[in-house]
UniProtKB/Swiss-Prot annotation:
Species the sequence originates in: Salmonella paratyphi C (strain RKS4594)
Cofactor, free-text remark: Binds 1 zinc ion per subunit.
Keywords: Aminoacyl-tRNA synthetase, ATP-binding, Cytoplasm, Ligase, Metal-binding, Nucleotide-binding, Protein biosynthesis, RNA-binding, tRNA-binding, Zinc
UniProt family annotation: Belongs to the class-II aminoacyl-tRNA synthetase family.
Subunit structure: Homodimer.
Enzymatic reactions: tRNA(Thr) + L-threonine + ATP = L-threonyl-tRNA(Thr) + AMP + diphosphate + H(+)
Cystine bridges: none
InterPro entries, per database record: aa-tRNA-synt_IIb, aa-tRNA-synth_II, aa-tRNA-synth_II/BPL/LPL, Anticodon-bd, Anticodon-bd_dom_sf, Beta-grasp_dom_sf, TGS, TGS-like
EC number: 6.1.1.3
Name used for this protein in its record: Threonine--tRNA ligase
Length: 642
């Protein structure tokens, strides 16, 4: 009979099989009321599942991350329950958990309107407020199939036929008259599922295959309590205000159009930001001793077959042909960099060789996945590859890590999560090689006093990697930086150097990206700063404006002086009221507005206002220029008044 060991090390002895709910009741009624599921020997199980042998047990409640995920999964079933009541002929497909919520794909003979979604959410609340018990039944494959055949659930039948072994016992979850199939676990009672909201609908092909029927996907969010739900909805509201697509249009940074899906048309101001980022990155490339190169836009398919990309990545590659040869438009820069490395004999004395490129890449992303600058088909990578010996890995990774933090610093990201992905089951190379490589990455992180977590088995087959994830002001995660060891590609493309022993050796290749896609990073910055770019990045840094025509000459003279000082400046000599001009340039998020009236002309000064509405008073022109130059040169996040 089972001995149950709890997280605090205490044990409870039973003379019969028990469920997590039984143990929770044994501990106390308060815990039992809060119990959503259990973790038995590390595996999540339903609160009603019986434990027959000795086991470790942790009770899962809504306070646990797993508990919240279970609530969301059960809300997907609740959605199914409600939609079958409103539209009984609906066929249910799949309803998984996603970040912050859930969705369900349904086959419905009507296109859901906003009114339909509101009615569906209302019915979900009515059902949840009944606080009914969710009943789990393990049945044979044949019984499960018969259940769904009788209910006309063709997609569930297809899942059983194609994905579940005949000797398996699927779990059926009964929500009153509604039945769904799932691995589980799920909440024991719907009292846990009161705090949710349906968010939107979209189209989705069955099994993600465009040859299959288009279904309707209903998205929802769910939380453990009302406070968390409201906080999330407020974050969404703030995110909508910061949406880079909206701000990009307001500030005339770029546009996209149907004739070039996923490709960016950069306007002057947006391209100014892009070029300033390039200048910044180039300054760091020089500091960290990189060569800058430029590879071709496309290369023969034969090369991509050698690298393995054709076998594993061809669906994401654009191709073209000429004179009976097929070419691939590059989705990444690494094969081209190996070709540059291969030109001329290399010695160990030439290593490490650090090669960087602002590489123009293209990937055939699904049209439904495209999203402004965040998910595009054409993008520029701040990509680099380091060719080195095994003995140089640690020092090179160390330098990469320093460079990553050095480059993130001017943008003010306060939270950076670092993960080290280790060897997968399927991999190349010896265990000794992986031992050393993983140790080199870990030690490099430790030497830089960077906390990190392991992602066991999540490395690529050709080497371990470090991932850097930025969290923005809304606590959204953006995975940008990567340091990836590669023991495969150099040998596939016959890269070699002559070692100290005069023998040919294959170099180790380190893939290194910091900003990632330049387009995506500009999208991230646009939302992080809500369009209030720091002065060094702002497309227009200063606007000089007159109050009446009599100051026009002084404005032009001052504008020229600012231009000569390397400041991006515009003159506004329009015959408009000064309040109108100030408001317009404030909405354009111009960092500084210099107002010139008769007093300023007479004193050789200028009245300085900021886009945040602060009046800095009348200041000496040369002092203003000097302070602006210092702010821009230092790439400061702070403005003069701050």
């Amino acid at each position: 009979m089972p001995v149950i060991t709890l997280p605090d090390g205490s044990q409870r002895h039973y003379d019969h099989p028990v469920s997590p709910m039984d143990v929770a009741l044994d501990i106390g009624p308060g815990l039992a009321k809060a119990t959503i599921a259990g973790r038995v020997n590390g595996e999540l199980v339903d609160a009603c599942d019986l434990i027959e042998n000795d086991a470790t047990l942790a009770i899962i409640t809504a306070k646990d991350e797993e508990g919240l995920e279970i609530i969301r999964h059960s809300c997907a079933h609740l959605l199914g329950h409600a939609i079958k009541q409103l539209w009984p002929h609906t066929k249910m497909a799949i309803g998984p958990v996603v970040d912050n919520g859930f969705y369900y794909d349904v086959d419905l003979d009507r296109t859901l309107t906003q009114e339909d979604v509101e009615a569906l959410e209302k019915r979900m609340h009515e059902l949840a407020e009944k606080n009914y018990d969710v009943i789990k039944k393990k049945v044979s494959w044949h019984d499960a199939r018969e259940t769904f055949v009788k209910r006309g659930e063709t997609y569930k039948v297809a899942i059983l036929d194609e994905n579940i072994a005949h000797d398996d016992k699927p779990g059926l979850y009964h929500h009153e008259e509604y039945v769904d199939m799932c691995r589980g676990p799920h909440v024991p009672n719907m009292r846990f599922c009161h705090h949710f909201k349906l968010m939107k609908t979209a189209g989705a092909y069955w099994r993600g295959d465009s040859n299959n029927k288009m279904l309707q996907r209903i998205y929802g969010t769910a939380w453990a309590d009302k406070k968390a739900l409201n906080a999330y909805l407020q974050r969404l509201e703030e995110a909508a205000k910061r949406d880079h697509r909206k701000i990009g249009k307001q500030l005339d940074l770029y546009h996209m159009q149907e004739e070039a899906p996923g490709m960016v048309f950069w306007h002057n101001d947006g391209w100014t930001i892009f070029r300033e980022l390039e200048v910044f990155v180039r300054s760091k490339l020089k500091e960290y001793q990189y060569q800058e190169v430029k590879g071709p836009f496309m290369m023969d398919r034969v090369l991509w077959e050698k690298t393995g990309h054709w076998d594993n990545y061809k669906d994401a590659m654009f191709t073209t042909s000429s004179e009976n040869r097929e070419y691939c438009i590059k989705p990444m820069n690494c094969p081209g960099h190996v070709q540059i490395f291969n030109q001329g004999l290399k010695s160990y004395r030439d290593l490490p060789l650090r090669m960087a490129e602002f590489g123009s890449c293209h990937r055939n992303e699904p049209s439904g996945a495209l999203h402004g600058l965040m998910r595009v088909r054409g993008f520029t990578q701040d990509d680099a590859h380091i060719f080195c010996t095994e003995e140089q890995i640690r020092d090179e990774v160390n330098a990469c890590i320093r460079m990553v933090y050095d480059m993130y610093s001017p943008f003010g990201f306060e939270k950076i999560v670092v993960k080290l992905s280790t060897r997968p089951d399927k991999r190349i190379g010896s265990d000794e090689m992986w031992d050393r490589a993983e140790a080199d990455l870990a030690v490099a992180l430790e030497e830089n006093n960077i906390p990190f977590e392991y992602q066991l088995g999540e490395g690529a087959f050709y080497g371990p990697k470090i991932e850097f994830t930025l969290y923005d002001c809304l606590d959204r995660a953006w995975q940008c930086g990567t340091v990836q060891l590669d023991f495969s590609l150099p040998s596939r493309l016959s890269a070699s150097y002559v070692g100290e022993d005069n023998e040919r050796k294959v170099p180790v290749m380190i893939h290194r990206a910091i900003l990632g896609s330049m387009e995506r990073f500009i999208g991230i910055l646009t939302e992080e700063f809500a369009g209030f770019f720091p002065t060094w990045l702002a497309p227009v840094q200063v606007v000089v404006m007159n109050i009446t025509d009599s100051q026009s000459g002084y404005v032009n003279e001052l504008t020229q002086k600012l231009q000569n000082a390397g400041i991006r400046v515009k003159a506004d000599l329009r015959n408009e009221k000064i309040g109108f001009k100030i408001r317009e340039h404030t909405l354009r998020r111009v960092p500084y507005m210099l107002v010139c009236g008769d007093k300023e002309v007479e004193a050789g000064k200028v009245a300085v206002r900021t886009r945040r509405g602060k009046d800095l008073g009348s200041l000496d022109v040369n002092d203003v220029i000097e302070k602006l130059q210092q702010e821009i040169r230092s790439r400061s996040l702070q403005q003069l008044e701050e």
